[in-house]
């Protein structure tokens, strides 16, 4: 039986060969998916890929780009949004 903490779906099961040619099951946390743009779904640059506890240890400037909607919209969608807002004034 696996330990209760390993029953979560956030752990990947990896088979390893141990002493005496035994098959062992190691558990490793699965990777977090890459950040995507909220409008078009493109991958975002400058946004770290990691679990919340790992990202919490980073400084503010390492967590996301320092521009409006940084970490939520890609530069192309941001440009479109700014133009749209300027035209609606």
From Swiss-Prot:
Keyword Ribonucleoprotein carried by entry = yes
Ribosomal protein listed as a keyword: yes
Report the InterPro entries cross-referenced here: Ribosomal_eL34, Ribosomal_eL34_C_sf, Ribosomal_L34e_arc-type
The entry's cellular-component GO terms read:
ribonucleoprotein complex; ribosome
Q: For the region Disordered, give the residue spans.
A: 1-32
Q: Which Pfam families match?
A: Ribosomal_L34e
Alphabetized, the UniProt keywords read: Ribonucleoprotein, Ribosomal protein
Q: Name one GO molecular function term.
A: structural constituent of ribosome
Sorted alphabetically, the Gene Ontology BP terms of this entry are:
translation
User: Membrane-crossing residues?
Assistant: none
Its domain of life?
Archaea
* Similarity comment: Belongs to the eukaryotic ribosomal protein eL34 family.
HAMAP family, from UniProt? Ribosomal_eL34
Q: What is this protein called?
A: Large ribosomal subunit protein eL34
């Amino acid at each position: 039986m696996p330990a209760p903490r390993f029953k979560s779906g956030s752990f990947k099961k990896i088979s390893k060969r141990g002493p005496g040619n035994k098959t062992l099951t190691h558990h490793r946390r699965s990777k977090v998916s890459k950040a995507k743009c909220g409008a078009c779904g493109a991958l975002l640059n400058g946004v770290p890929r990691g679990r919340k506890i790992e990202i919490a240890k980073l400084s503010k400037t390492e967590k996301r780009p320092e521009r409006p909607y940084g970490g939520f919209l890609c530069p192309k969608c941001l440009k479109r949004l700014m133009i749209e807002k300027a035209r609606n004034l």
